[in-house]
Every structure is written in structure tokens, then in C-alpha cells.
């Protein structure tokens, strides 16, 4: 910002004349910005980066902001406190909690079903243009209100006092931390005095909502400017007090807590105590307490750096103290004051609630508990915080009484100005006042659509500017799991099993996305009768996850889990009239094989939703032909470490998936370099989970290969589509050649009509390598002839075995239970490498 450029407008610093010109077109600016939706996830990322900068004293921006605040007249202690409070409020955890508490979701703008059994969609959408008339005595309030407006997706114009630039600088820096540019186009900061009514009138005329702070007269003046239909969010004057019973008012700790609350922010906060009430009828107890409090307050003020009141504020303090001293002659009051006027304790034997002149001036009054309602209820519209000093039993009784009389918050002495993430403000949730709840009630054409946004386009969520983390280095992402509450272990099919960390919010959110994916795949929560046959136990998440997915869908579920007695499971399917199965392909095939007679005769199973491994096409054909199964689709594409990643719709080919674009960002990168793979080419899948709380998952290389699919899907969704093309582990080096497990599977299916398990075993002896291909079937079944078929149909294998003589190749047939599987999930291990260098 250069000299004369005093205002911040959508990413630019402008002067008075330009601001005047743009104000005439404010509605046009707002309309253009609102046409490009802003996800709360984008705001979260930018705020978290800014919070990190504010906690670093060496950060250049933090240094500039500190200097600016001191130049604006803020005391050193207040500067430090303000920056600390702002950093805490902008942290990812604080804002995530706020969104969940106030709007019920971390991305509340999704127009999604609240009940997955009905075609009814709801979302929290922005009011539109939100004007914030910020107070001059609290530097952070305006900026934090704008951030709440951004979380709701609004275009925000904040009016600050004419001289101070804290809000300008902080919000401009926030916009700089956003890679998309969407935040900048939703922020305007104008610094001008309240006497400039023409600008304020223009702002209010264009506004869809106005948030205002100030006294009654100021709020009334703004209300007169607000047009019909515009929402006025009134953060008007509030009054807070402490209330002490006899067993608390003699405690030095309680008095020290009250003194600390009086001194914090020079008593400028709405939650600062202006009165201390005592639960007594005795005048002497009031006067004695005031004397003790004065001594403690004097010590607290001496240890702080109090700001000096303005000329008008000093005049109000002087007038109040003078009148109170005069009333001493009537036996009504007693004044205790510092010689330099830095603090005042004003004892008053009348119970009526009244505001103090602030700047460490506090009333002490009697208020017997039986009179709480009588005295406080007439002032109910002004009451905010009560610092309750009482026994455990009395606290419960008295808290109920003051809340019934109109108070909004009850805390303890010393904590009156403290808060917690997601706390209501003045009895309401701010985010709900900055948003509007909308709904769409549709029909059966949308039976498989969980979110209407997917029919419009994908969320524009960019990956963070960090290095890629390979799957083998997953533990690097677990440097901070302090928020983790739930742990699951991977099945181990792609390496050593490892624990993944989640919060409960992560878990429930992932299950919601999983349920949306199953709905898109064709599951009918109102009509289908499902049996969950995934593996469970040993920290494995398969069974438990799909139990919760079906719970989210509120579907009929029989949670059988995978059992060793496949025939028993088949009988249970028939007995309980199950028509839909969830499980892993190899396990489900064993159930159909061993329960073939019952299942074929019953013919009730119509849908299969699978996960964990590939379902060969030949085996799908067998199930459709022999058992009448109509739908066989992936229940979800995901992993224990990364969560849900993609889903299939009714038009998806076998390996094709839509991206969960509101949850993940996918990059498909070149096989050798960290750059995007060429169009249509196979690349490495790298995911960023934007809402993960238990551990961050930024640019994580999952270990799978795939390619982007071009064109729009016939299902109508506009979310990105990709095709899975195997795993890194499917490609292995043997006999100096790179071979692919998927090629062995393809040859088995196409040339041998094989629809059982396929496994590659690698070992070595006497310096030579051996590759054994294990096929499910009767032992010794034409192994040599089958080996020749593979050599004929797989040229790279033939080169290694026949031409170069570097590899021995054998085929063996084995029973189903001879195949090596992961201990936790029972998933088939595609490649088992026993070579010495891999042990």
C-alpha cells in the first residue's frame, strides 16, 4: 500500500476517489464474485497458513502488523494478546470446530441430502453482500467477523475507523495466502469515520446483511439505513458481572480472578465484569469486600500496562466517581481509587444493575439470590456473561437462575473473557446469522444423487505447495496425531501394516461420503436388504466402515462379517431373504461356490458391492449367468490410510471411478517425474485430503496407478473421472525385466477362462530367480501346458525366461486356502516376494 491508497478492494489498494467510484458499482462487484462459489475448505486452508505466520515472531508480516498496532496506539500487552487471540481463532482446529458446531458440516455449502433415503437437499448458502460496521475499540472484531462471513461464502465489506489499518493489513494478508484468488474478490475494507454517512448509506443500500457493533444510538442509526428485507445482525451493547457467594468472596484466588478479568483488554470486552454482585443482605459485607477487592486490583493494575482512556472516556470516569463520592454522604456508596486514577472500586448498597465507566472501574453491589430475577430480568436484553464464584451445588442453582433472568454465559472468575471453539455469541451462532438455509425437494430422477453440486461441477480445491509423500514414507505424515481418536490398521496388501489416525469427525464424515458413493452405485436404502460380509477385527476397518455406511443410509443391514464357514453364510443369506451383499470379491466367490445349490435355487441376490481388490470380469459374468446377479459394482475406491477416494455410478466401466471432489484433490503424475502425466497416459495417483483432522494427508502418493478419463459421464455428474490401472506393487522387476501382475490375470481370464485367485511368488536359489504363478484349482492340473500359454501370450515374460534365460517360470494349481493373504483383512496378496533382498 502506497501513500494515499487507504482502502483495500478485492485484492487492490485504492485511493479515496477510486473507492468513491467503485461504491457506485458495489452491487455489480458483489454479483460477479458470488457467481464463483467459495468453499469453506478454501477459507480454512488460507486461515491456517495465516495463523501459522502470526505465531512466528520472526515472520515479516507479524513484525509489520505489530509495529502498525503500536503506531495506532495499542499498548504492548494488548498487541501481544490480540495477535495471540487472532492466531488461535484462525487455526484449522478452531475453525473446523466452529463450522461443525454452528453449521453442522465442514463444507456446509454442499446442496446435499440430509436423509439419504429422500430426494430432499439442503445447504447453508451466503446471504450475499455482508457489510460489517466494526467497532473502533476492539481491533480484531471486524477482521474475525469478515472471516465468519467468508466461511459462509459471502462477499464482505467492512467499515473500520478512519485511522487504524489492522483490519486492512490482516485481511489483505489472508487473501495472499489463498492460491485460488476467491478470498480476495470477497473482501473490501474501507476506513472512514462514522460522520461520513454518505458512504455508510451506500453500503447499507446494497447489503443483504449488515453486522453492526456499538451503543444503542449507533445501532439505531444503522438500522435506519437498512432496507426492507436486509438482515440486521445486531451485536449491540452488553453488560457482564461477577456473582459471588459467601464461601467464594473471601477466597484470594477468586478476588485475583476478578481483578484479572477487570484488567484484561482494559475492560473493553462485552464479557468484562462491570459489576461484582454479592449474595448478601448485609451492607457491611459489601463494604468490606470492596476494600479487599481494591487492594487486589491495585496489585493487578501495577503489574499490567494499562492503556490511557480518551478525553471523553476520562470525563465519564471523573463524572461517575464524583457523583459516587457525593452519595457517600447519604450512606449509599464508598469509593476506592488509585491516586493516578488507573482503577476504581465503587461500592454501592443499591442492587440495581448499572454500567461502569470502564478502564478498570468496577461496581460492588448486594444481590441476594432470591432477588436475582426481580433485579436482572428488566435488563435481560443487555446481559451477557456471569462469572460465578460459588460452591459446586450453589453454582448449579445460581447458574440456572441467572440464565433464566437473561444472561447468555456463565463462567468462573478469572475466565470471563475466555472462550471455546464453537461457542455461541450473545446467545446465537454467528455463522447461522451470516447464512441462509435453503432446500430443494425433487423426485425419483435424482434417486442416486446425494449432492446436486456434483451435477454442476467439481469443487476447486488446490493441493498445498508441499512435497509429495510416497506411500513407503506414510509415517512422515504422522508427526502430529494429537487430535487422533480412532485408529485403523491397513490390511498390509501393499506393504507392512500400519496404523492410520482419525478423529471421530473424520470417521463419521468418511462414512457419509462412503454412503453417498454407494447410493450413486445403485444401492437402494429404501428397498434393498443388505448383508455385510467384510472382514472385521484386529484394527481392520472394512466391516466396521460398511456397518457405518449402511447406518448412514438407514438401510436394512445384517452385519454377519466374513466367517470361515462359507456354506453357513450362504444359508443365512437365503434364510434372511438377503438380496444385496457387501464384501471382498474372493470371499464372496467362496460363498457362492460353497453355497452354490442354495443360492442358485433361491435366486434372490441381485446386487453385489465389493471393495478391497479387483473383481475379475469373468467371475462377474459367472455370477450374472449362474445366479442372476444384476448389479456388481465397487462399493467404494479408498484405502485405510487415505479414506474414501472415489465411487462408481451406474455408467462406470469396471475400473472407472468418479472422484470425491468435495473431500479429495487428485493429481495424476508422471511415472518418473513430479509433473502431470500426459493426457490419457498412466500415472501415479497423488491425493490431498482437505478435511482430515486426525493427521494431515497432503499430496500423498497412494501407491495406485491410473489415468484421467476424458469427456462427461452419461450419468450427468461433472466430477472428475479416472481409471485405475493397478498398483505400483503390481509392477515388479524379475529376470532384469519389469513384469505386471495384471498381465498374468488378463491372460488367465482370456486364454484359460479362469475365474479363481491368481498369485505371483518370487524367490531365488543358487543365484537364479524363480517366478511361480499360482492359480486356484486342482493341484498338478496341466501345469506345463498352462505355463506355455503364458509364455506365448506375454512377450516380456518370454524374453526373460526363453530368450535371456534369466528367470525360471513355473505354474502351480492350488486350493483356495493355500493362497497367502493379509492377516487382518484376508485380502489376497497379488505378489509375494521372498527374494533375499526383500526379506
Q: Language-model features: where?
A:
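Rossmann-like NAD(P) dinucleotide-binding subdomain of oxidoreductase/dehydrogenase enzymes
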Residues: 110-263
Amino acid at each position: 500500500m502506497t501513500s494515499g491508497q487507504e482502502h483495500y478492494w478485492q485484492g487492490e489498494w485504492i485511493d479515496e476517489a477510486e473507492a468513491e467510484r467503485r461504491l457506485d458499482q458495489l452491487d455489480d462487484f458483489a454479483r460477479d464474485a458470488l457467481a464463483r462459489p467459495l468453499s469453506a475448505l478454501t477459507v480454512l486452508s488460507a486461515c491456517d497458513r495465516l495463523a501459522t505466520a502470526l505465531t512466528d515472531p520472526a515472520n515479516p508480516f507479524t513484525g509489520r502488523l505489530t509495529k502498525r498496532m503500536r503506531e495506532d496506539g495499542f499498548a504492548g500487552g494488548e498487541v501481544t494478546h490480540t495477535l495471540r487471540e487472532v492466531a488461535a481463532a484462525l487455526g484449522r482446529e478452531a475453525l473446523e470446530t466452529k463450522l461443525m458446531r454452528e453449521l453442522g458440516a465442514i463444507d456446509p455449502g454442499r446442496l446435499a441430502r440430509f436423509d439419504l433415503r429422500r430426494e430432499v437437499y439442503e445447504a447453508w448458502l451466503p446471504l450475499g453482500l455482508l457489510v460489517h460496521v466494526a467497532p473502533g475499540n476492539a481491533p480484531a472484531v471486524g477482521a474475525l467477523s469478515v472471516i465468519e462471513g467468508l466461511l459462509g461464502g459471502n462477499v464482505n465489506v467492512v467499515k473500520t475507523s478512519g485511522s487504524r489499518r489492522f483490519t486492512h493489513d490482516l485481511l489483505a494478508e489472508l487473501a495472499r495466502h489463498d492460491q485460488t484468488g476467491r478470498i480476495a474478490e470477497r473482501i473490501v475494507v474501507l476506513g472512514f469515520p462514522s460522520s461520513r454517512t454518505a458512504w455508510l448509506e451506500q453500503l447499507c443500500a446494497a447489503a443483504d446483511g449488515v453486522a453492526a457493533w456499538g451503543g444503542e444510538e449507533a445501532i439505531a442509526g444503522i438500522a435506519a439505513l437498512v432496507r426492507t428485507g436486509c438482515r440486521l445482525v445486531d451485536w449491540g451493547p452488553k453488560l457482564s458481572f461477577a456473582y459471588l457467594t459467601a464461601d467464594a468472596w473471601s477466597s484470594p484466588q477468586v478476588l485475583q480472578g476478578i481483578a484479572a478479568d477487570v484488567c484484561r483488554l482494559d475492560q473493553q470486552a462485552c464479557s468484562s465484569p462491570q459489576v461484582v454482585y454479592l449474595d448478601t443482605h448485609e451492607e457491611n459485607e459489601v463494604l468490606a469486600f470492596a476494600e479487599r477487592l481494591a487492594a487486589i486490583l491495585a496489585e493487578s493494575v501495577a503489574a499490567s500496562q494499562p492503556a490511557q482512556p480518551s478525553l471523553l472516556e476520562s470525563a465519564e470516569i471523573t463524572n461517575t466517581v464524583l457523583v459516587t463520592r457525593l452519595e457517600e454522604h447519604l450512606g449509599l456508596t464508598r469509593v476506592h481509587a488509585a491516586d493516578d486514577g488507573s482503577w476504581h472500586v465503587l461500592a454501592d448498597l443499591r442492587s440495581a444493575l448499572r454500567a461502569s465507566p470502564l478502564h478498570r472501574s468496577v461496581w460492588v453491589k448486594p444481590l441476594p439470590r432470591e432477588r436475582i430475577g426481580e433485579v436482572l430480568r428488566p435488563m435481560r436484553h443487555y446481559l451477557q456473561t456471569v462469572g460465578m464464584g460459588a460452591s459446586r451445588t450453589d453454582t448449579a442453582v445460581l447458574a440456572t437462575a441467572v440464565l433464566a433472568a437473561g444472561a447468555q454465559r456463565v463462567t468462573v472468575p478469572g475466565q470471563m473473557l475466555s472462550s471455546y471453539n464453537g461457542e455461541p455469541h450473545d446467545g446465537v451462532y454467528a455463522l447461522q446469522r451470516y447464512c441462509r438455509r435453503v432446500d430443494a425437494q425433487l423426485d425419483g430422477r435424482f434417486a442416486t444423487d446425494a449432492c446436486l453440486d456434483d451435477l454442476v461441477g467439481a469443487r476447486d480445491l488446490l493441493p498445498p505447495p508441499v512435497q509429495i509423500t510416497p506411500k513407503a514414507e506414510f509415517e512422515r505424515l504422522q508427526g502430529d496425531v494429537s487430535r487422533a481418536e480412532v485408529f485403523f490398521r491397513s490390511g498390509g496388501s501393499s506393504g507392512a501394516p500400519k496404523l492410520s489416525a482419525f478423529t471421530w469427525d473424520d470417521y463419521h464424515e468418511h462414512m457419509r461420503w462412503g454412503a453417498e458413493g454407494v447410493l450413486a452405485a445403485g444401492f437402494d436404502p429404501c428397498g434393498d436388504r443388505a448383508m455385510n460380509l467384510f472382514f472385521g477385527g484386529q484394527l481392520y476397518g472394512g466391516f466396521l466402515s460398511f456397518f457405518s455406511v449402511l447406518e448412514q443410509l438407514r438401510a436394512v443391514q445384517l452385519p454377519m462379517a466374513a466367517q470361515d464357514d462359507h456354506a453357513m453364510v450362504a444359508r443365512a443369506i437365503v434364510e434372511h431373504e438377503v438380496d444385496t451383499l457387501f464384501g471382498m470379491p474372493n470371499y464372496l466367490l467362496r460363498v457362492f461356490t460353497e453355497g452354490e445349490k442354495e443360492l442358485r435355487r433361491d435366486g434372490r441376490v441381485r446386487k453385489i458391492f465389493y471393495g478391497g481388490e479387483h473383481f475379475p470380469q469373468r467371475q462377474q459374468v459367472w455370477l450374472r449367468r449362474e445366479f442372476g446377479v444384476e448389479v456388481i459394482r465397487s462399493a467404494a475406491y479408498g484405502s485405510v490410510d487415505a479414506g474414501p477416494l472415489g465411487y462408481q455410478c451406474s455408467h462406470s466401466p469396471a475400473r472407472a471411478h468418479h472422484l470425491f471432489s468435495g473431500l479429495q484433490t487428485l493429481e495424476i503424475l508422471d511415472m518418473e517425474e513430479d509433473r502431470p502425466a500426459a493426457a490419457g497416459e498412466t500415472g501415479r495417483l497423488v491425493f490431498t485430503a482437505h478435511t482430515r483432522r486426525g493427521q494431515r494427508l497432503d499430496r500423498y502418493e497412494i501407491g495406485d496407478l491410473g489415468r484421467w478419463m476424458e469427456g462427461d459421464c452419461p450419468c450427468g455428474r461433472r466430477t472428475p473421472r479416472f481409471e485405475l490401472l493397478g498398483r505400483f506393487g503390481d509392477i515388479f522387476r524379475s529376470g532384469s525385466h519389469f513384469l505386471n501382475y495384471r498381465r498374468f490375470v488378463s491372460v488367465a481370464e482370456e486364454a484359460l477362462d479362469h475365474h479363481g485367485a491368481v498369485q505371483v511368488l518370487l524367490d531365488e536359489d543358487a543365484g537364479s530367480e524363480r517366478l511361480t504363478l499360482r492359480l486356484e484349482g486342482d493341484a498338478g492340473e496341466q501345469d506345463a501346458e498352462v505355463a506355455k500359454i503364458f509364455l506365448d501370450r506375454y512377450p516380456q515374460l518370454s524374453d526373460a525366461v526363453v530368450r535371456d534365460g534369466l528367470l525360471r517360470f513355473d505354474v502351480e494349481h492350488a486350493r483356495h486356502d493355500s493362497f497367502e493373504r493379509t492377516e487382518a483383512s484376508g485380502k489376497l496378496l497379488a505378489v509375494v516376494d521372498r527374494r533375499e533382498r526383500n526379506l
